Amino acid sequence: MNIQKLIIAALTATILPTSLNAQQTFNEMMYSKEKTMFILNAPTAQKSSVTLRLYKQGQGGKAYKTLKMKKLGDERWEATVKGDLKGKFYTFDIGKGETPGTFAKAVGVNGNRGAIVDLYDTDPSGWDKDVRPALKSPADLVVYELHVRDFSISPTSGLKYKGKYLALTEPKAIEYLKNLGINAIHFQPVFDFASIDETRLDKPQFNWGYDPKNYNVPEGSYATDPYSPATRIKEFKEMVMALHKAGIRVIFDAVYNHTFDINGSNFQRTYPDYYYRKTKDGKYSDGSGCGNETASEKPLMRQFMLESVKYWIDEYHIDGFRFDLMGVHDIETMQAIREMVNRIDPSIYIYGEGWSAGSCAYPTEKLAVKANTQQLKGIGAFSDDMRDALRGPFSDDHQGALLAGLTSQEESLKFGIVGGIAHPQVDMTKVNYDKEPWTNNPTEQISYVSCHDDMCLVDRLKASIASLTDKNIPEAIRTAELLRIDKLAQTCVFTSQGVPFILAGEEMLRDKKGVHNSYNSPDSINQFTWTNLQKYPQAFAYYKSLIQLRKNHPAFRLSTGDKVRQHLEFLPCQQTCLVGFQLKNLEGIDAWKNIIVIYNFNKEAKKMQIPEGNYTVACCNGVINEEGLGFVSGKEVEVAPQSALILYQK
């Protein structure tokens, strides 16, 4: 293709309405009983070089039919095959290796061949009546980050469909999640990824799944039959429907920033080098840390992301999107996605990691990094300021912070408490990573202390706080301290403004045996330890009460920066490792008129000045009771060691 054609194609892609352009570009297989039409957008393919192959199996065997595709006038290639092809498989080949295309919607085992299915056949009974759980504000979300296999694979889970989508449809699983109180599950990758051999599921295999292969097909290893293209689709929908009936939203982990590899990717085998960024010296850029980075700023990649997000919403009823390494993507694309989603349903929440894993071959000021979040209207980002203020830096598992009783992180925590907005009582010169506020509203901050990346909370606490692993200290005392600190950590998360987020299993003091990066660790490391519910019942009870406390009180869920500045005031304090604030003048907002929250990270009880008055104690020394644990009066209170104190006035 000459330069003039490239320019015209780029201009056309920019000018044409996104929906029309995407539909023309990415609708690669159109099935009917009478015929199936195949269309591939392959602008650089040479004349008479695009081959369509049809197979009877999803893997193995020779093609029973081979056709040369005809070039259309707009750099697309077309072939039509008469007859009912349902149940057959196909590949495209432009001379770079066979591929199911960039936008396959059904595939065979291991995702190497596209599958010809009638998607209506994959809808479970009642799917047309499936309803997205209501959501007034992102601040009302309680996000639970979950790996499908982790949740149910343990022999102690008591679930039938271990490691499968269907485990999340079983009554025991649903009741557990409802009892905990979460209302949104962020699933780690559930698209078809390359790092699990679906033909060897008799052999234990594990991977988080951040290895994209087919972006628009559910992963087959979580289905009861990965050889059946329709099964993975139907069972995924059954899972979504069961969660929706339980009032739980489903959030999709969108890993558009890289592919598993380059040469074997569907992008590269369809339009070589187009979908990836390169450095000035012609090498593939690696802002993802995975060997490549995609070029979201290019028209076709942008359209691909838009159409993919829309497809997961339309076909699978997805309720939110978490963008992996969002900082690799450009601001314009992320904003286009937000605007498109707003037209579908503005309650669909979008957030992501406001960083990359390396240097990107694109100007930083144009990337969706955390520092540019204020340009991303209605898109949230993870607060590493808050995370590291509590537990210590990402770069050193053994370095603690406030939870270890170490000082100097108070302002960073305060910045997290207000939801990353500008607040007159937060000294930005003392905040961890940001010297300017990066959100306009608290709903643009994900508040958290741990996630799937690096150590889980229990392991991190043990690695950074010596007394938790000191064998000279009786185990009962060590366990009691671990529980105190763990509860304190999550109290900070759930009583802060923003969108609270927890790693699944932390409510039962889940650990990963100290493994820092368990992306491919065996089940013995990653699986839930369900027996912990009997071992540490007070942990689950506290998490449940904490979640309910937040749900019951809108004061912890203020939706705008102005409301936070109006109602949240920090208490004066000259002591270290002690942070307190009041939510005041809440008439018309909350049943509690004034709320006092104090976090004591010290190993000794501490006293703090509060506005003089009579208060009911709702949380004290690791116990929550909204009806009241007692009463205090005056202008000074004592806070137990390594715990939170919550008081209120009606």
Question: Which residue stretches match the model-derived regions?
Answer:
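Conserved alpha/beta catalytic core and glycan-binding cleft of carbohydrate-active enzymes
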Residues: 114-117, 121, 338-339, 347-509, ...
